[in-house]
Amino acid sequence: MLFEKQIYDYLRGMVSIPSVSNTPQEKEVSDYIAGCLERQPYFAKHPSLCGQCALEGDSLGRTVVYGLVRGKGAGTVVLTGHYDVVDTDEYGRFRALAYDMEAWKHIHGEELEALKSMLPQEARDDLASGEWLFGRGVNDMKGGLSIGLAIMDWFGQKVLEYPETTGNLLFAAVADEEAYSAGMRGAVSLFTGLRQEYGLTYDCLVDLEPSFNEGGKQQVYIGSVGKTMPAVLVQGAKAHVVECFHGLNAIGVLAEMFMATELAPEFSETFEGEHCPPPTWFNLRDRKYGYDVSVPLRAAGYMSMLGFSKTTSQVMERLKEMGRRSFASYMKRMESQEALVRSGNILPKVDLEHCVLEYGELAEICRKKKGYGKWYQDLYGKIESDVRTGAMNYPQATLEMMDAMLTFSGITSPVMVISFAPPYYPAFHSDRLGETDRAGRTGGIQAGGIQAGEGTRLYNLLQKAAEDTCGLCLGKRNYCCGISDLSYCGGPDREEMASYAVNAPLWGTMYRMDLDAMADFRVPSLLFGPIGKDAHQMSERVHARSLLEEVPVILQQFIEQMFANT
């Protein structure tokens, strides 16, 4: 089956919709994708097997678009990807080009020269070659979704023509991957529901994210890095600037924490020669909302922390130790500085007691206070409203919750409170699904369990399909460090999720996961899609041959091999 025109048409339609994360246009593109599925012959005959599953409590009305082609047996391959994109600010006056693939082919003269002046040289060369398609989302990742839709149509028609065809193919397009992955978090419940309803066994999931070439090999990931976002709130001791040595500047303590953690090598894990990027802070500032001549009482910030295997409990314990050292280091600095500038105007050193608390410990203190229940409901509701209207993002809302809880607690002495802000991405590796976790499971709930090394086996099968169909050589990578929805395919154990939830101020209706569904959804997964370049940039593009010819037939062969072995 030739896929070129079908994939191109699907992609052009999707790209034309500016489905930026957390905007109403996400729902618009999900409706478009649902329409594409509904018009396919298989779903025209079996309309109950495709549809849209609403994300619970989502103010934008976003959905998971899905379709299930049912053959014989329980074995199932899942194709998935996200339909949201990042904004197009960097396009400037050429913003219209972001959503019009065809326009890139027809721009000429002075306009073409002006456009080229905004592109790096490699992108100019690729544009001139005619071998690449440009536009927002062609690479990340509407190109992959377009392939997925075409593959669904191929397999659906195959089942219609040959009802005895073995295997099931499930397609799911999700929202919000570029922000908080609300779509994939919601999709897990859909996947578990479909499995129970139709008796499916999920043998493999392919996230159709773009690939890249390295050393002449198209790279395939069998895992995805984990991510937490620790948020830190420091309360010092207020003092007039004239008496600065009598107080404790919260910014100073937070700065010590920043220096201890920013790009810290101890958090950079290594796995089979691959290195995880170290932590980096996204935000750091005082909590003063006006001007006065006192040292800041409070300061706060949040950082991104990636990992291959470390748990949220391990992260929290290490950060608490660093917090204690940050207090000690800054207070020692105050002593040495005071000795250098001592005069008659400087007050004697005051020894300040201090502590470091997990958010869960602060919340426990607050729960014992009179009137906490009603006060907390009002606070949570107000902040949730601000998040829904866009007045705050999740990390900002986390800091607001922490600040309000600390005030309600009545704690007036210096303290550091550490929590987790959304989003949370558990580390995932397909080869490690067979390992026993803390809950004693080995390989999940599917019949026969999941064998250790399953990701490598699937990669080898994909490699064979690439060689047989296109003569291509693939390369295996363990972890995608760019964050992906694969994080929700590994069934993190309930104990670890509970450890995260108790220290996440927004946990509840603002940010949630179906813990039972997540714990039970364990499927070997791959990241594999068309070759692309410069995601999130004006020069974003996808290789036409990879998109329209190579990846579709590789996946076609891979799926047939998967079902031939069941």
Describe the residue ranges of each PLM region.
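Acidic/His- and Gly-rich active-site-bordering loop/insert found
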Residues: 2-136, 158-167
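Short, conserved micro-motifs enriched in small and acidic residues
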Residues: 24, 133-146, 244-251, 545-549
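An extended, acidic, His-containing surface patch that forms the Zn2+-binding/catalytic region
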Residues: 30, 46, 339-566
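A glycine-centered beta->alpha junction motif in the catalytic cores
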Residues: 85, 232-239, 307, 527-539
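Acidic/histidine-rich catalytic neighborhood of metal-dependent amide-processing enzymes
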Residues: 128-223
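Short glycine/serine- and small hydrophobic-enriched flexible loop segments
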Residues: 149-157, 256-263, 556-560
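Short glycine/proline-enriched loop/turn "hinge" motifs that connect secondary-structure elements
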Residues: 162-164, 221-227, 291-297, 408-411, ...
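Midchain, well-structured core segments that form catalytic/ion-binding scaffolds
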Residues: 192-399
